[in-house]
């Protein structure tokens, strides 16, 4: 675009504020030289580096105040969500389970009784985000009709779903009491704003020519649904994303095919061009040497360390 003297707007999405600052630092030399600019004043080629939370807040404009965010950082926000979900789960296990267990499946009851509460809370958080909020729009009747996710909470019958929805209500009450909105509330509200006649008219002018997404595996399906609505074109999606599907923290069961479908629809999935990295670029040789030294030492590494507790005694 620069060689042709054509305008080009790029959006670079990071998952957390720390990552955003690091990415912006990498582009700082080009920004200082005026090769690209943040606002279009110095160059026709513009770059916007931000987090999805911040971008969605800009879309919502003045409809949400700073104090209503769980946290501006998506990672911290999701950790707070998990704590609220754990509290809601424990309340439901204590108050609702005794009266509802006779209507619930044996498999789901065994899961609730045998699995660690933190693990169940993570699965419930995913159920709330993707199914109850994302697909059912917090409608109880719609949720009961939805099929179980392949990698989701192991609900088998309507009684299981009733219990999960009661846990969601306990979670929602905690958000209401604190006067805050979680990441999914903000993203889904922004999606509503991006599906209006006003945005469809403005899209060709205010959308992005290209979008780059870092650590895509950390985003859930609700969050990924935003990106194909903010490109200039509504049928071509010039999106570049990096993903480590072995982590799959944002959503359960991510693989290469489901990523392609989420980032452009099944009709666009065949047009993607994957690049598989077999080398590790994150670690410098010094860090690799240190890691090798630690693993080679085994348990003997810790035998010569000073014990401050023993000295205190």
Predicted features along the sequence, with ranges:
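Conserved P-loop NTPase motor core of helicases/translocases
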Residues: 27-29, 35-91, 189
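Conserved helicase motor core of SF1/SF2 NTP-dependent helicases
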Residues: 7-9, 15-30, 34-37, 50-56, ...
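Coupling/switch/interface segments within P-loop NTPase motor domains and analogous charged loops
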Residues: 69-181
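Short glycine-rich substrate-engagement loop in P-loop NTPases that contacts/grips substrate
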Residues: 179-190
């Amino acid at each position: 675009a620069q060689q042709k003297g054509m305008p080009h707007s790029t959006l670079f999405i990071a998952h957390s504020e720390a990552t955003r600052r690091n990415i912006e630092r990498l582009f700082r030399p080009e920004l200082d030289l005026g090769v690209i600019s943040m606002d279009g004043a110095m160059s026709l080629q513009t770059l916007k580096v931000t987090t999805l939370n911040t971008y969605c807040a800009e879309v919502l404009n003045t409809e949400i105040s700073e104090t209503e965010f769980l946290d501006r950082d998506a990672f911290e926000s999701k950790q707070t969500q998990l704590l609220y979900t754990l509290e809601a789960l424990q309340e439901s296990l204590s108050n609702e389970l005794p009266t509802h267990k006779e209507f619930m499946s044996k498999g789901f009851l065994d899961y609730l009784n045998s699995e660690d509460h933190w693990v169940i809370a993570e699965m419930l958080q995913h159920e709330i985000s993707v199914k109850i909020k994302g697909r059912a729009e917090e409608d109880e009747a719609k949720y009961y009709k939805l099929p179980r996710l392949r990698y989701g909470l192991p609900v088998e019958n309507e009684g299981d779903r009733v219990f999960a929805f009661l846990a969601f209500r306990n979670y929602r009450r905690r958000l209401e009491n604190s006067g805050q909105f979680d990441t999914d509330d903000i993203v889904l509200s922004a999606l509503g704003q991006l599906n209006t006649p006003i945005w469809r008219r403005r899209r060709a002018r205010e959308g992005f020519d290209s979008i780059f997404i870092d650590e895509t595996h950390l985003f859930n399906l609700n969050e990924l649904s935003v990106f194909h609505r903010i490109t200039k074109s509504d049928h071509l999606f010039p999106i570049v994303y990096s993903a480590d599907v072995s982590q799959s923290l944002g959503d359960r069961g991510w693989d290469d095919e489901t990523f392609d479908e989420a980032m452009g629809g099944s009709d666009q999935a065949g047009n993607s061009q994957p690049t598989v990295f077999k080398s590790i670029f994150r670690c410098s040789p010094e860090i690799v040497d240190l890691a090798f030294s630690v693993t080679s030492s085994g348990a003997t590494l810790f035998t010569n360390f000073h014990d401050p507790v023993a000295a205190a005694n």
